[in-house]
A protein has these predicted regions:
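N-terminal, active-site-proximal structural segment of metallo-dependent hydrolase catalytic domains
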Residues: 1-77, 81-91
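Structured beta-strand-rich core segments of catalytic domains in phosphoester-bond hydrolases
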Residues: 54-142
Length: 142
């Protein structure tokens, strides 16, 4: 089984330009130009299970399109996507923040999928995917 974990950084880009016109200004940029390049990269890797952290699940950045669903559709996989912030988190009440998520894409049958939240920290999501021969946990600590 080939497992890949990738930090999408919401598909907004990387490098020095990410910090223009002000530090972390790229965080607010649209993601359309980068998403198809990422899909090509993921296709080349041929991962059976693809964990994605820092994805956009439908804010203005991604033109209100869930990046995990789009990538899964392009790769012929099944998406499991959840907001990074728990139901009681005030971060989850902010429009842009509540669309920040993690995802797991899988081409194999998924027997069970669950979300757990850690007691402490800002990003508390733990995603659990049960496959035929293995259970996978996706966690992005910050």
């Amino acid at each position: 089984m080939r497992l890949m974990l990738y930090n999408m950084r919401y598909g907004t880009g990387t490098g020095f330009k990410f910090h223009l016109p002000f530090p972390f200004g790229g965080f607010f940029r649209k993601t359309g130009k980068n998403l198809d390049a990422l899909v090509r990269f993921f296709r080349e890797q041929k991962a059976d299970v693809l964990g994605l952290v820092e994805i956009d699940s439908g804010s203005y950045r991604s033109s209100h399109r869930n990046q995990a669903n789009y990538i899964a559709w392009k790769l012929g996989q099944h998406p499991f996507c959840r907001s990074k912030y728990g139901h009681r988190s005030w971060w989850g009440r902010l429009p842009l923040m509540r669309k920040q998520a993690n995802a797991c894409l899988c081409g194999q049958p998924v027997l069970n999928q669950r979300s757990h939240f850690l007691r402490k920290g800002v990003k508390r999501l733990v995603m659990e995917l049960e496959l035929q021969e293995v259970v996978i946990f996706i966690v992005h600590l910050a």
